Structure formats: C-alpha cells, structure tokens
C-alpha cells in the first residue's frame, strides 16, 4: 500500500507547480496503437503491472471497449515521470481514433496543450491522422510524433536500416506537410517535428520499446542493436535497453508546453471574452489565486458518485463546496467532490488549482463543452465537431413501464455526448437518436441496456438528409394568422466559402456578439458589406439577416423571428429534414403596435411559412451525407473492392500502391454504406483494412430525389407526394 500512498503524495505536491505539469493526449488513426501506447506508458510510470500492459488496455475500462478493442471514451490518467533530476506530473487523455467517436477527440483537445500523434510505420499517415491533427492544431495543441509498429518493418517487411530510414522520412514529411497546412500562422515553422531534436520517436508500443535520437546519443543504443534483438526475439533485453515510457515521456516533458506557457497563446484563441480583463489575465497566466474558471470536457456516470464531470482548470482553484455558475445553462451549482485521476481511479482532494485536469461532482446541469466559473463570464468558444449526426434510429421501450427510465437515460446520453442528438417524434411517440455512424449508435444502445437496464426495439438505421436551394427567391410575404403582421423575406443559397467558414468555426454559430466583426468577415468572403451588417443569427449552417430600415417594434419581435427561423431550418418544406446553406433576409415588415397581437402564436407561423414558401420558389433540392472510405487491400482483391464500391454509388478519388498493399480512397453516400463491414470482409476474404470518415453533404441526383422524398414523408406519416409550391405557399 506504501507505494500508492507515496504516489498520491507526489501527485499532490506536483499539481501545485504548473511548470512541472504536462497536459497531453494521444491521437491517431484507428488501430495505429494508441491505447497500447497509453497502457505501456502507465506501466512504465508504475500505474499498472508491466506484464499486463498492452494486453490489459487500462484506458479501455468500459467493458464494450475491451470487447471491441477500440477506444470509445476519452479517459484521463495522471502519472509521474522523472526527467533530468526533476519529477513531472503528466496528465494523459486517451482519445478514440474511430471516426464515429470524433466528438470525444474534439472535446479532449480542449483540455490538453500537447499531443503525441501516433502513426503506424507500415500504413503511414491515414485520413483519420489528418483529421485528428487538424483538430489538435485548430485548438492550438502542439504535436510530437511517435512512429509505431516498427517491429513490423523488421519482421514482416524485412527492411534494412537504410530502407527503414526512408520509410520514417516519408512519415515525418507527411506529418510536417499537415502541420504547415493546418497550424496557426505563428507556429507553422516552430511546431514542425524533427528527428534530431527528439520531437520524433519510433518504436513498438506492443513490445514496449522506443528510440529517439537524443536517447541514442545518451545511451549509445543503435538501430542495429534494435534490429538484432528483434530478429533474435530477445524482447526483455530490448525493453531494458530502450524502454518505451522513458523515451516517449522524455519527449513529452521536453517538447510539449506546460500550462503556464500554453495558456498565454491558447486563451486568446479559445476564449471570446476581453483578454485585458482581470479574469482574462488570470486565465492567460494560469493564476491559481484568480477567480475559478474550468471547462468541462467529459461527463461520465459513476455507479456510486453519480455524474462526474472531468475538465481543465484554466484559472483559480476548484474547491469542495464552492458555489459556481454553469454559464451556458444559466444555472448555479455547488461543487460536491473534487478529485484528480490516477489511472482510471479518482483520488479525492480538497482543492485542485489552475493548470490541472480535475474531476468534480455536483454539476447536474453541465454538458460536455460547458464553461463553469465562480462568477458569470463570457463562455469559451463552442466546441467544433468535425462531423455531424448523419444516421438516425427510432427506439421504443419494449416494456411501457421502462419509459420514464428510457427518457432519463437518453437525456443522460445526450449530456455525456453532445454529438448525439435525441428527439421525440411527436406523432409516433418514438425517440429518435441521431449519431455519427452505425458504430456510434450501436455502442450507445448497448450502454442503454447495460447501464440503465432498458430493453428497446430499434428500427433499421435511417440516413439524415438535408434540404437546400439553388437560386434566389423573389420577395415573399408571410402573414400572421390574425393578418395584423406581415413579413417580407428573400432566401438565397449560401456561398460555399461562407458555409465552410461557419463549419470550421471561423464564423461562430449563434447570435454574434459583435456584428461588425462578423460582417467584415462575411464581406471578405464576398458578401455585400451593407447586407452583411444585418447579421442577426447563424444556425446549423444557415443565416438570418435583418436588412430592413428603421422599423418600429421590430426589436420587440426579433427573438420570436429568430425562434421561427430556427423552426423553419429544423424542418424544411420538402420532407421536414434539416435545412443547410440557406441565407434568409428580412427586407421589410408591418408589425402591429399592440404586443397582444404579436405574440408567438402570430409571429412563428408568419415567418416560418414565408421562409418555406420562398424556399419552394428557389428550386429546393435534397442533399445526402457522404463518407470518405479508405480501404487497404492486397493487390489481388482490388477488383472485388472496386465492384463493391461501384454498387454503392461510390466515386474513386485516389489509388496508390505501397509494397504489396493497394490503398483505395473513394467517397460514397452514407445511405449506401449500411452493411458495408460484412460485405467488404466477404469480398476480400477478411483481408481488407478500412476506415470511414464524414465527407460532408452532396446533392442527391434528381432521378433519385423524388423517391427518397417519398420514402421520408411516408416514414414521417405525411402525404408521400412531394409538396408543390401551391401546397406550401398560402393563397394570397
């Protein structure tokens, strides 16, 4: 027991010295060896036994993760590492590499300052590597590189040292190309990874060894030694000569920033408030004596403690019993327990200061991504998720008495994972659960059963489509039911550049805090500045502008108009699917002076009908979600793979050969990708390795659209025939 007590004591001392803290994550393409690396780092730091590491997958402590062998929840672990003659506290957040769990990666990036990017030496940089690296750099997280599975180059590909070096150079060049492409301007050169300074290490997470140039210089171990020991199968000596945790954690301590350094440049980027203010300065300097601010990155349900919120403390100190504001939810709460992590276990503390990763209970209203502070402050930038929910299932409780439990469970799931959308279908009484892909939903449904004991009937997965338009509408009038209010609007398609800027967070969603700044940005992207100045709201990739001149009473109904705009965007006119890439401009209005005659029951239908009618006059179209599919397959199965993709309306983007393996990159509609896993295994006798990621939305070919609209409308209990302009526009 002595050793554990000692570690807790050391962690308590180190967490008070932010210069000695490293908050870091490990990010990679699926199966490139991320969790194995995490476990062996823990073993080296004395957190779990060395024999078990790599087989145990400590960070995969959800039973489902261990069964599937992929990491689903980003978990946090603290460990101690000695470098030089100093000790350091390393907080490690494990993130999933599977594209369906991209939301977890995005949230974890908010809490960390540096990341180890893991790349498989055989497969090289893959699409998901690019996605996670882009997310890291967007959140101002500094990367270092670990090239994994080097044992495969020696054993399977039998490469000599020269060929191995060429392979490494290629991976490093690819990673640096991505850093140059995505890093913030001031870090494009500073953050490039380099073999000589030790910001690159290579090794085998599974066999627990690693090397870096500084380590080779320090110890005299050479590449030839590694090849000889691997070929001789002497793994024990190999581990002793080049221990993975020493090499990798040395790289982390030496090259990744501590919270004091990192917050100087991260806070101005991540936080929207006034940097010169007292709280802004306190966060930028990671001041433990300032007012407390933390951001929640993950919520998990603990059988004993209830909801546990994990987050990063940016300023001040989180204390037991402290009263805090949950900013976006506009609620107050009292913190009950405060703790930090050691392995998957939480150790209770009285207080945890700025710069640390903390676990707290008592924040019932907080969701992942929420800002929690001692006093009401400007919240942090909303988190940007790189994909959006594209697959929906309808679920019903098998047993009526389980219904209240099902509702509570779904509320909880949506809170733990904001990339999951839950909606109740008013007409059928079914609960609709939308997620990033088949696997994402499958995992959540197993959670429902195992954690909550609710048995559910699940429909076949349904694809979430989007509605949009292709041309500008004439001015359309929308009348309130009492005829006392009239709104005149125009809708037009949103240019791709503007849509992209919203998706990537350059233009924030929601009501802009400073309309001038947003208008300027829109003007840079080609919108007329005078029109752009009217920006009122951005919602799910659509925009609402007020281009009227000095109208009386307009301010008093603006909130209702924005709500009505949201309703119109949530369900478009064609099939009641969400709308994307539409700009709605209010150009004139006549509003009743008496507020009794302009309540929600009058304003909502007026604006909603006007928007839908204008969309029907703008050549409405349907968009469907696409996935990028990357398949690695032996040369002889290439034909089978091409046939499989062609049957699924797939388009070939790129094809290249690496050794014996063909890498085939294509894009296909999500609707055609159900059941793909079984089919591709069958077509290639199980030899294909593949991964998918969200590739945005594309227009549905006209010949297919009518049928799809019919199916969607039928499923929703509407008249199956696609509506015409007459059906939607009120007869004048």
Swiss-Prot record:
This is Elongation factor 2. Residues 19-230 form the tr-type G domain. The keyword GTP-binding applies. It comes from the Archaea. GO terms for cellular component: cytosol; ribonucleoprotein complex. The keyword Ribosomal protein does not apply. Signal peptide: none annotated. Pfam families: EFG_C, EFG_III, EFG_IV, GTP_EFTU, GTP_EFTU_D2. InterPro entries: EFG_II, EFG_III/V, EFG_V-like, EFTu-like_2, G_TR_CS, P-loop_NTPase, Ribosomal_Su5_D2-typ_SF, Ribsml_uS5_D2-typ_fold_subgr. It comes from Thermococcus sibiricus (strain DSM 12597 / MM 739). Catalyzes the GTP-dependent ribosomal translocation step during translation elongation. During this step, the ribosome changes from the pre-translocational (PRE) to the post-translocational (POST) state as the newly formed A-site-bound peptidyl-tRNA and P-site-bound deacylated tRNA move to the P and E sites, respectively. Catalyzes the coordinated movement of the two tRNA molecules, the mRNA and conformational changes in the ribosome. Keywords: Cytoplasm, Elongation factor, GTP-binding, Nucleotide-binding, Protein biosynthesis. The modification Diphthamide is found at residue 597. Belongs to the TRAFAC class translation factor GTPase superfamily. Classic translation factor GTPase family. EF-G/EF-2 subfamily. Coiled coil: none annotated. One of its GO terms (molecular function) is GTPase activity. It is found in: Cytoplasm. GTP binds at residues 28-35, 94-98, 148-151.
């Amino acid at each position: 027991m002595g050793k554990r007590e000692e570690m807790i004591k050391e962690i308590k001392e180190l967490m008070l010295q932010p210069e000695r803290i490293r908050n870091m994550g490990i990010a990679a393409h699926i199966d490139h060896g991320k969790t194995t690396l995490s476990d062996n780092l823990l073993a080296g730091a004395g957190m779990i036994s060395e024999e078990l590491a790599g087989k145990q997958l400590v960070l995969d402590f959800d039973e489902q993760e261990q069964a599937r062998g992929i990491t689903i929840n980003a978990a946090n672990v603290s460990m101690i590492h000695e470098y030089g003659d100093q000790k350091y506290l390393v907080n490690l957040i494990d993130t999933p590499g599977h594209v369906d769990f991209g939301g977890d990666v995005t949230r974890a990036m908010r809490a960390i300052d540096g990341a180890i990017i893991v790349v498989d030496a055989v497969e090289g940089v893959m699409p998901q590597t690019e996605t996670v690296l882009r997310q890291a750099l967007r959140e101002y997280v500094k990367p270092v590189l670990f090239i994994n599975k080097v044992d495969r180059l020696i054993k399977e590909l039998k490469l000599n040292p020269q060929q191995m070096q060429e392979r490494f150079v290629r991976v490093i060049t690819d990673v640096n190309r991505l850093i140059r492409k995505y890093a913030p301007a001031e870090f494009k050169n500073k953050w490039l990874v380099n073999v000589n300074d030790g910001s690159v290490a290579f090794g085998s997470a599974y066999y627990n060894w690693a090397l870096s140039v500084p380590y080779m210089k320090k110890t005299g171990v050479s590449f030839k030694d590694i090849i000889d020991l691997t070929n001789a199968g002497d793994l024990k000596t190999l581990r002793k000569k080049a221990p993975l945790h020493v090499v990798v954690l040395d790289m982390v301590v030496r090259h990744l920033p501590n919270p004091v350094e990192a917050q100087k440049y991260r806070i101005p980027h991540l936080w929207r408030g006034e940097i010169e203010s007292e709280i802004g300065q306190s966060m930028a300097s990671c001041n433990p004596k300032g007012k407390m601010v933390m951001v929640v990155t993950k919520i998990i349900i603990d059988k004993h403690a209830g909801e546990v919120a994990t987050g990063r403390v940016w300023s001040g100190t989180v204390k037991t019993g402290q009263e805090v504001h949950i900013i976006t939810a506009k609620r107050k709460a009292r913190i009950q327990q405060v703790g930090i992590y050691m392995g998957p276990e939480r150790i209770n503390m009285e207080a945890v200061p700025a710069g640390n990763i903390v676990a707290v209970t008592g924040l019932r209203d907080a969701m992942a991504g929420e800002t929690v502070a001692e006093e009401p402050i400007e919240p942090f930038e909303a988190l940007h998720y790189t994909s959006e929910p594209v697959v929906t299932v309808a679920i019903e409780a098998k047993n009526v008495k389980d219904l209240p439990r099902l509702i509570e469970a779904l509320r909880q799931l949506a809170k733990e994972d904001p990339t999951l959308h839950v909606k109740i279908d008013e007409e059928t009484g079914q609960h609709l659960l939308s997620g990033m892909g088949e696997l994402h939903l499958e995992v959540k449904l197993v959670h429902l059963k195992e954690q909550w004991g609710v048995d559910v009937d699940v429909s076949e997965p349904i694809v979430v489509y989007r509605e949009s338009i292709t041309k500008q509408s004439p001015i359309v009038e929308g009348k309130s039911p009492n005829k006392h209010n009239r709104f005149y609007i125009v809708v037009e398609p949103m240019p791709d550049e503007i849509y992209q800027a919203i998706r990537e967070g350059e233009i924030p969603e929601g009501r802009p805090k400073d309309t001038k700044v947003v208008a300027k940005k829109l003007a840079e992207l080609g919108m007329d500045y005078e029109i752009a100045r009217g920006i009122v709201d951005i919602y799910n990739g659509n925009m609402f502008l007020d281009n009227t001149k000095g109208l009386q009473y307009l301010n008093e109904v603006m909130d209702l108009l924005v709500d009505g705009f949201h309703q119109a965007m949530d369900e478009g006119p064609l099939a009641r699917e969400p709308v994307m890439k539409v700009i709605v401009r209010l150009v004139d209005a006549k509003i009743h002076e008496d507020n009794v005659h302009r309540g929600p029951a009058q304003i909502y239908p007026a604006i909603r009908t006007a928007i839908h009618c204008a969309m029907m006059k703008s050549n409405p179209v349907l968009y469907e979600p696409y996935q990028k599919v990357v398949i690695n397959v032996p040369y002889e199965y290439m034909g089978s793979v091409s046939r499989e993709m062609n049957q699924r309306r797939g388009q070939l983007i790129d094809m290249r050969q690496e050794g014996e393996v063909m890498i085939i990159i294509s894009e296909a509609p999500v609707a055609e990708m159900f059941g793909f896993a079984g089919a591709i295994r069958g077509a290639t006798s199980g030899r294909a390795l593949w991964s998918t990621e969200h590739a945005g939305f594309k227009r549905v070919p006209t010949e297919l659209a009518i049928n799809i609209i019919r199916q969607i409308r039928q499923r929703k209990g509407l008249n199956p025939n696609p509506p015409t302009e007459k059906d939607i526009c009120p007869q004048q």
